[in-house]
């Protein structure tokens, strides 16, 4: 099911920056936000509790990757924060993914990271010694995530159609690296606009700097939301 709101990546490290950004929005505007490593490691669980207290949805993007028992226990702790979505690394293997599902339970959405959108095929082959194509690697990880009963994967929008062709109906694709037309792509290698991501079948999109660093973040958010909605 397509999420109508773009997920905003809160690429901050301080509580003050985070609060100042969220305070720009009307109280009745309930957002879906991503808390990544920088903000979570700086502020800890309290930042999740604060944002949830405002009525926003929280995607906690920590990309867990460890032995199954450790991941299971960590997910059980994160479940107590009432998060709406969490991530693990698909490279941890099917048993680790199953353990993550057991720890988090069936309520929150659980998705696996396949290949980062900052990774090119040449980098994957050189750094990871994976000699298939980038798409084949992503499809392999996606099928493993589906086998482990995860809800979906993080992937580039260019890979969405192929992933949906080899996974069960309802398997979701969350797409980072979304940039409005004409914006700076930064360190992302595989990017699309919100309109392109919608047309190709992405279920969630994540947008950070084009919103958080905009002169008018609320206007930027509303414009991207409208483009995403079609």
UniProtKB/Swiss-Prot annotation:
Q: What class of enzyme is it?
A: lyase
EC nos:
4.1.1.23
Q: Where is the active site?
A: 63 (proton donor)
From the Swiss-Prot or TrEMBL record, what is one GO molecular function term? orotidine-5'-phosphate decarboxylase activity
Q: Does the keyword Lyase apply?
A: yes
GO terms for CC?
cytosol
Please list the GO biological process terms of this entry: 'de novo' pyrimidine nucleobase biosynthetic process; 'de novo' UMP biosynthetic process
A Pfam family that the UniProt record links to this protein: OMPdecase
Which keywords label this protein?
Decarboxylase, Lyase, Pyrimidine biosynthesis
Record-linked InterPro entries: Aldolase_TIM, OMPdecase, OMPdecase_AS, OMPdecase_bac, OMPdeCOase_dom, RibuloseP-bd_barrel
Q: Which reaction does it catalyse?
A: orotidine 5'-phosphate + H(+) = UMP + CO2
Gene3D superfamilies xrefs: Aldolase class I (3.20.20.70)
State the pathway, as annotated in the record. Pyrimidine metabolism; UMP biosynthesis via de novo pathway; UMP from orotate: step 2/2
Lyase found in the keyword field: yes
**Xref: SUPFAM superfamilies:** Ribulose-phoshate binding barrel (SSF51366)
Q: Where is the signal peptide?
A: none
Amino-acid positions noted as binding substrate in the UniProt annotation, renumbered to this chain:
11, 34, 61-70, 117, 179, 188, 208-209
Matching entries from PANTHER family are given as: OROTIDINE 5'-PHOSPHATE DECARBOXYLASE (PTHR32119:SF2)
What binding partners and quaternary form does the record give? Homodimer.
Q: Which family does it belong to?
A: Belongs to the OMP decarboxylase family. Type 1 subfamily.
Q: What does this protein do?
A: Catalyzes the decarboxylation of orotidine 5'-monophosphate (OMP) to uridine 5'-monophosphate (UMP).
Indicate what this protein is called per its UniProt record. Answer: Orotidine 5'-phosphate decarboxylase
